[in-house]
Regions:
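Hydrophobic beta-strand positions in extracellular immunoglobulin-like domains
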Residues: 42-44, 59, 93, 109-110
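Solvent-exposed loop and beta-edge segments used for protein-protein assembly and interaction
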Residues: 32-34, 49, 83-85, 99
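Short acidic, flexible loop segments centered on an aromatic residue
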Residues: 48-66
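Terminal connector regions
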Residues: 88-131
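Sec-dependent N-terminal signal peptides
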Residues: 3-16
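Intrinsically disordered, low-complexity Pro/Gly/Ser/Thr-rich segments with frequent PxxP/GP/PP motifs
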Residues: 63-98
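Low-complexity, acidic Ser/Thr/Pro/Gly-rich terminal tails and inter-domain linkers that flank the onset
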Residues: 16-39, 45, 121, 126-131
Length: 131
């Protein structure tokens, strides 16, 4: 009987964990001590293909917000991003000061293949329908 309870607890804890729908990897590269090339890679862990993916790449220097750029990683006319696959886009920023800035990417719009609904995604809130 104890074995069944232990197995039940292990299976329920494994299934009860939240899956993260997207993993985001940001890699800044310094180019000729004048520019920063920022590569943003997003991996789809959702069980559905993503037809459109848009977000904002924010630049920070310490705690100070310096600005942001809009990035569309997947357009409607491109093939959908399948589960387990990734897409990468790059953007350039000017080097301000001696040390490079830090960057953060936030997903603002997600549209799944075959749907008309548009969602926003946040790591703490999950998917929020916006259109």
């Amino acid at each position: 009987m104890k074995r069944y309870i232990i197995i039940l607890v292990l299976f329920s804890s494994a299934w009860g964990q939240k899956r993260i729908p997207f993993s985001i990897d940001i890699r800044p590269r310094l180019i000729e001590d004048a520019k920063i090339l920022v590569n943003v890679e997003v991996v789809n862990h959702v069980g559905r293909p993503v037809d459109y993916l848009e977000g904002f790449l924010s630049e920070f220097s310490g705690d100070q917000f310096l600005g942001e750029k809009r990035m569309v990683l997947i357009y409607h006319y491109e093939p959908a991003l399948q589960t387990g696959f990734s897409t990468t886009k790059s953007s350039t920023f000017e080097l301000k000061g001696n040390s490079p800035s830090s960057f953060e990417f936030n997903i603002s719009k997600v549209k799944f293949d075959g749907e008309n609904r548009v969602f926003a995604w946040h790591p703490k809130s999950g998917f929020i329908r916006i259109d």
